[in-house]
Regions:
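Short active-site neighborhood of thiol/selenol oxidoreductases, capturing the structured segment around
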Residues: 54-65
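Thiol-based oxidoreductase modules, predominantly thioredoxin-like and allied folds used
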Residues: 62-63, 77, 85-110
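Acidic, Ser/Thr-rich peripheral helices and adjacent loops at domain boundaries
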Residues: 106-120
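Non-catalytic, surface beta->alpha helical segment in thiol-disulfide oxidoreductase systems
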Residues: 119-162
């Protein structure tokens, strides 16, 4: 069931941080993500703005190594977090669909049970929660309004902050 308020402590304790996410990458898909991570160069001024605006928020990332868009977007986001570790973020990986069951979007396990707490439709998805655990914005698959991930996240925070 989709929650309106999420337990921040639970999310932080049941997920992985960026260093562990990168460390656990393996196989061909993992190598592609690592290459994309190394290559990504965020816009420094925008990244600084994101770091400032992100204070008090938690970024929750759902992804899978096999996912084409995840290999790009999650690698870029991970690079941003490595450069700005003050941006509070957690990662859930290993998302798998349930193609043989039309009543279930994501198969749990192997997908983490937290997929059912969010209205997760596609991956990658980056949810932004306020300090109370309320969803204030999301980015699904790729930036929709801005050319780069960091600009899109600033845009989402600006909209939420009014």
């Amino acid at each position: 069931m989709v929650k309106e308020i999420h337990d921040i402590k639970h999310l932080e304790n049941s997920s992985v941080r960026v260093d562990e996410m990168i460390k656990n990458l393996s196989g061909t898909d993992g190598e592609i993500i690592k290459e994309n991570f190394e290559k990504y160069e965020p816009i420094e001024e925008v990244l600084s703005e994101l770091e400032e605006k992100a204070k008090g928020y938690l970024f929750v990332v759902f992804s899978a190594d096999w996912c084409k868009d995840c290999k790009i977007v999650v690698a870029a986001f991970a690079k941003m977090i490595k450069l700005r570790p003050a941006i509070n973020s957690v990662f859930y990986k290993g998302i798998k669909s349930a193609p043989k069951d039309p009543d279930i979007r994501w198969r749990v396990p192997p997908s983490p049970p937290e997929v059912n707490d969010f209205d997760l439709r596609k991956i990658p998805t980056i949810y932004i929660l306020d300090s109370n655990g309320k969803l204030i914005g999301e980015m699904i698959e790729n930036p929709e309004h801005k050319p780069t991930l960091e600009e899109e996240l600033v845009y989402i925070l600006d909209k939420a902050q009014g």
